């Protein structure tokens, strides 16, 4: 079959980028590393200045945030991963606070312009369609608004469906590469996380639809669901943890109202095993983040369960999930998209689950959030709160009532301190309340 495109080198491709341009880089494990390297080489050679780099969470190297590129690249992430965290905290890079579900809107409505979108796709089929692979998120919107789209054709990119399929006519410049997708190892849950997983699993009914992020706690929850039935998935991301449940027939999606029988997400992150699973799999739909994270779409799924975590929670129920005090650690992400959506679902539950302390024994349940902390989930939004000491429902509870409930699932070492802080805030009635709650 005649080749459907003419490829150039990465070095040739990035020559379309000019000083002052805004460049979007595709996300997570689907970063076009050869284009990133070629762009940085141009910057290092003194050919560019004030080029704006935008992306969501990315894996792998992010050299454009290094001190040598100050004045050359202006970095603005919608979510801060480990590869750019230190630079953001030092002021060498920057962060745009935004709900994950609204990142596409930033491009489509031109709040942020996109001169060039650098993406990675699978080889075209006989009809000329490529796939965005493991991450659609805001990349599709960036493509639609970009003046130029540079695509790396890579045989390791899985062919996924839903909004992931795009025609090669929408791509301006092609580059070929065969670098494997960046795999992400999932840590094994410790005993504390396993206990949290068990408490959360008790809140999940047969026929529920799940959203949960990446990490030890989501994996711990999934490992407790082997006896559940007809679980559905509508989420912003999923990883290897769902594979045993699919194999066992626990995940069917038969109770979903929208996309019945389908696993719906906007990106996938994990090992080669999960990328192989989604490759050519019509049961998986990767959709624009504007769809997956729309609270009013989420709310239509019956028994919608969202499970998210936090860095700190205070006694009023405010959850910080994006910063360590004033230092940005990650980002808003899709937490509030799903907290709001799940709480409006018929039979749904919005869960914030986290250990009561850090691995170093630092208390995560505090009288008030640290100075500069972002209240990602507000005291008005929180419903269920789970630690290794239990699960409490804060919805409809007064400030004093919820303080007592939160203290009840705090680490015993810190309960007296928290009780004293609440007494100081609320007065003698607080202790009366404790005996009558």
Which role fits each region the language model picked out?
Residues 1-437:
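Conserved alpha/beta enzyme-core scaffold
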């Amino acid at each position: 079959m005649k080749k459907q495109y003419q490829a150039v080198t990465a070095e040739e491709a990035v020559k379309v980028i000019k000083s002052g341009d805004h460049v979007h880089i595709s996300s997570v494990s689907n970063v076009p590393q050869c284009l990133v390297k070629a762009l940085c080489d141009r910057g290092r050679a003194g050919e560019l200045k004030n080029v704006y780099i935008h992306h969501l969470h990315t894996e792998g190297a992010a050299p454009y945030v290094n001190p040598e590129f100050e004045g050359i690249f202006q970095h603005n992430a919608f979510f801060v991963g480990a590869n750019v965290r230190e630079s953001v905290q030092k002021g060498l890079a920057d962060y745009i606070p935004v709900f994950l579900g609204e990142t596409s809107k930033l491009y489509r409505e031109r709040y942020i312009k996109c001169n060039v979108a650098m993406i990675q796709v699978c080889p075209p089929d006989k009809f000329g369609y490529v796939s965005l692979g493991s991450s659609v998120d805001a990349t599709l919107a960036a493509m639609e608004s970009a003046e130029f789209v540079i695509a790396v054709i890579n045989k390791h990119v899985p062919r996924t469906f839903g909004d992931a399929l795009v025609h090669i006519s929408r791509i301006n410049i092609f580059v070929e590469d065969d670098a494997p997708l960046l795999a992400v190892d999932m840590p094994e849950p410790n005993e504390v996380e396993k206990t949290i997983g068990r408490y959360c699993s008790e809140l999940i009914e047969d026929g529920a639809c799940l959203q949960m992020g990446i990490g030890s706690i989501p994996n711990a929850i999934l490992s407790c669901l082997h006896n559940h039935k007809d679980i559905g998935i509508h989420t912003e991301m999923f990883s290897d943890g769902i594979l045993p449940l699919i194999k066992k027939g626990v995940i069917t999606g038969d109770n979903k109202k929208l996309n019945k029988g389908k696993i719906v997400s906007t990106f996938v992150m994990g090992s080669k095993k999960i990328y192989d699973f989604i490759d050519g799999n019509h049961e998986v739909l990767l959709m624009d983040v504007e769809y997956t994270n729309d609270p009013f779409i989420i709310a239509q799924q019956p028994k919608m369960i969202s499970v998210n975590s936090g860095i700190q929670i205070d006694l009023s129920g405010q959850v910080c999930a994006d910063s360590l005090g004033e230092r940005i650690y990650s980002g808003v992400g899709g937490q509030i998209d799903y907290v709001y959506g799940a709480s409006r679902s018929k039979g749904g539950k919005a869960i914030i689950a986290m250990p009561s302390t850090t691995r170093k024994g630092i208390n995560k349940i505090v009288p008030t959030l640290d100075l500069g902390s972002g209240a990602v989930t507000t005291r008005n939004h929180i419903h269920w709160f789970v630690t290794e000491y239990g699960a409490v429902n804060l919805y409809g509870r007064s400030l004093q009532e919820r303080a007592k409930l939160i203290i009840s699932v705090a680490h015993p070492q810190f309960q007296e301190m928290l009780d004293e802080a609440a007494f100081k805030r609320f007065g003698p009635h607080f202790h009366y309340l404790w005996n009558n709650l």
